[in-house]
């Protein structure tokens, strides 16, 4: 959050220079970081929920930043409303945890979790509610529809929301609750299925997009599906590992896209771009590194995290050859 977020702030200083709402933009951006840190550093589900709602509000403000643009306002409202559906699931999960354990503090909940047998109804219910929350925030089927429209915000916002912070909050929440999810085979299988289907669907949609930012948006949805699938097959650590590596190369790709758009006077259609390497060599090489990383080229971070996910999808405690096959296909589609 702080590492990639700081780099995006530095980039945004130059990118937003001369914009009429310069100070408003950085107010929203820093408020977003504040709530994201609360979400990550809190020691209870209560604090996580405060941060969770805060980043939802800030994403609405940032996506709809261009107040004179109707499509931006509509995209902001769409993101806010769809996320409220997921938030309802999350808060129901928190209530279920509270009534089951008498506390929402992580340590107290996880210490008492072993008292319940595997497949206990209350644990399964809480985990399925958490999955609904994660589907909203991390853009999983069927609540993924808000993420591509979130491209209406300034490019640094796209980088921050899609790479470093907000959309990975759902994956973080599932991984943080791994003690509970591990006690519910139904929830684990559900998580893996939702993640696998999202990864496959988003990767196929990305293939037919012309808008450079929408390609990256659907690519993000696909990679989030990868992370969720990793958690579903029992590879929580590997899912978080891919979350971290993805934050860096996806932020790089979004900032590279912003650089290209800036040079081409906000042109988004990739078919109208060509020979940009000649005029923007630095952007070309950095973008190429980002593409190679997300494609899983050996030697780069994406290769190691994806390789581990595929291994667990095949041989993990909740793994299945179908998950491995979907993961392999999605890796190929992403590389293409």
Predicted regions and their residues:
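Hydrophobic transmembrane alpha-helices and their helix-loop junctions in integral membrane proteins
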Residues: 2-51, 57-336
């Amino acid at each position: 959050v702080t590492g990639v977020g700081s780099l995006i702030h530095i980039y945004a200083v130059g990118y937003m220079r001369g914009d009429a709402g310069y100070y408003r933009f950085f107010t929203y951006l820093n408020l977003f970081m504040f709530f994201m840190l609360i979400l990550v550093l809190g020691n209870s589900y209560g604090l996580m929920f405060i941060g969770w709602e805060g980043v939802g509000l800030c994403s609405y403000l940032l996506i709809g930043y261009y107040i004179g643009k109707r499509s931006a306002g509509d995209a902001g409202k769409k993101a806010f409303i769809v996320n409220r559906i997921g938030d309802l699931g999350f808060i129901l999960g928190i209530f279920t945890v509270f009534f089951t354990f008498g506390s929402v503090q992580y340590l107290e909940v996880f210490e008492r979790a072993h008292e319940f047998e595997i497949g206990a109804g209350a644990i399964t219910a809480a985990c399925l509610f958490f999955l609904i929350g994660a589907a909203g925030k991390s853009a999983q089927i069927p609540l993924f529809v808000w993420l591509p429209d979130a491209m209406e915000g300034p490019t640094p916002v796209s980088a921050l929301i899609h790479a470093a912070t907000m959309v990975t909050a759902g994956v973080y929440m599932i991984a943080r609750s791994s003690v509970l999810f591990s006690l519910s085979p139904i929830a684990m299988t559900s998580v893996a299925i939702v993640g696998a289907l999202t990864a496959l669907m988003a990767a196929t949609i990305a293939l037919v997009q012309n808008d450079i930012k929408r390609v990256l948006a659907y690519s993000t949805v696909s990679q989030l599906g990868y992370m969720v699938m990793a958690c579903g097959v029992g590879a929580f650590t590997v899912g978080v590992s891919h979350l971290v590596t993805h934050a860096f190369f996806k932020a790089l790709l979004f900032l590279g896209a912003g650089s290209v758009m800036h040079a081409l006077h906000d042109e988004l259609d990739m078919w109208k771009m060509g020979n940009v390497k000649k005029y923007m060599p630095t952007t070309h090489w950095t973008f190429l590194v980002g593409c190679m990383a997300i494609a899983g080229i050996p030697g780069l971070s994406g290769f190691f995290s994806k390789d581990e996910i595929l291994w667990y999808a095949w041989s993990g405690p909740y793994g299945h050859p179908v998950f491995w096959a979907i993961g392999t296909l999605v890796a190929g589609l992403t590389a293409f």
